[in-house]
Amino acid sequence: MLTSPSLSTLGAMTLSRVYGFKPQSIYKFIEEAGSIENLFRLDDNHRQSLKLGDDALEYSLKEWERMRALGAHFISIEDEAYPKLLRECEDAPIGLYYRSDSEPEEFFSHPMISIVGTRDISPYGRLWCQNIVHALAQTPTKPSIVSGLALGVDGVAHESALRESLPTIAVLPTGIESYSPRSHYQLSEKCAHTPDCALISDFSIGYPVTATNFLRRNRIIAGLSRATILIESKKHGGGLITARLASEYNRDVFVLPGRIDDIRSQGCNNLLEQELAEVIANLETLSSRLGLGRTYLSARGSFCERIENHYGNLPPEMLEDLLKVANCITEHRNDMMEEIAQRCSLTYSRVLSLCMMMQKDGLLQIDLLQRCHIIVKK
C-alpha cells in the first residue's frame, strides 16, 4: 500500500487527469471524503464508478515516474507551497506540475503580476510591454511576471522579465514536458533554469495542445496574480479572456490604452468602456497602484537622453538634428519619415540618414511604412 503522502500526491494527479476540466466535481468528491487521501482509501468499486479506481492510480504512478525522469515535480492544493491566491479561486487546479531549479516555496513567494495580450503584438505594444516590465523592476518589491509563453505579448513579457532580472513564471497549455510554440524552446529553458523562475501546468504528462486547453490555462494565469495587465487584445482575444477572469476573481485589471480604430486595442478599450479595468497612464504611479511601492525611472532616462549619451561626440549641429528627430519620434509615435521631416524642418534625406544611423546602432526599428519605433534596452 502506498504511504499517505504518495497516495495524496498520486490521488491529486489522478483527479487532475480525469477531471481537470471539471474542478467542481473534484472538490465535491474531496468534500464528501474529507481529503484527497481519504477519497482514494475508499472501496475500489466505489472509486471505479467515479473513474478513480486502482487502475487509474497505477497509471498515475507510471506518470509520476516519467515526470521525475523529466526533472519535473508536482504539488497538490493540500501542499503548503501551493500558491495562496490561486487556492482562493473556486475553480483552482487540484495540483500543478512544474519544472524549476528552485522550490515552489521560492518561486511562488514573490508577489505576482500577470501580463497578457495578443500574439499579433504591434511595435507600440512591444515597446510599452518592455517599459512596464522595466518600471516594475525598479520597485522595492520585485514582482514575478506571469504569462503564458505564447508568441507576441507573452514572449515579450517573459523575455523582458529575464532581461530585467525579475522572476517569471510561464503557464503552459500542454503537459509540462512540451514546448508550445516550439520557437520558444530556449525561452522555456531559461524560465525553467533561472533561479526563482518556473514552468508550470495543470495538464498531465503527454497531454496534447487543443483549443479548449487555453481557457483552462488562462484561469491559472489570472488566479495566480494580484493583478493582470492587458497590453493589447483584439475583440475576442485570449488575453481579454484572462483579464475578464481576473476581474471575476476580484483582482485588479489594468490595460494599455490604444487608438479606437486599432484592432489590437479593441479588447482593452472594451474593458475600459465596461469599467472592468483601469487605464495605464503613468508608469511611476502604476507600481504603487499594484501595491509594489513607488517606481523610480530616472536612471533609465528618456529616448532623447539615450541619444545624447550615445552620440555625444558628434558635431553639435548633427547632434542637434538628431535630438530634434528623436523628440519628434517620441511625441508622434506613428509619424512616417516625411512627416517627421516636416515637423523638424529638415530634408527627407537628412531624416532618413539620421534614422538609418539610429537603426544601425540598435536604437530604432523602421517598418515598411517608414515609421520609426523606439527599441527599449536595459
Task: List the model feature ranges, each with a label.
Residues 2-5, 76-378:
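Glycine-biased, small-residue-rich flexible motifs in mid-sequence functional cores and linkers
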Residues 1-81, 361-371, 376-378:
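Short, small/acidic-rich helices and loops at N termini and domain boundaries
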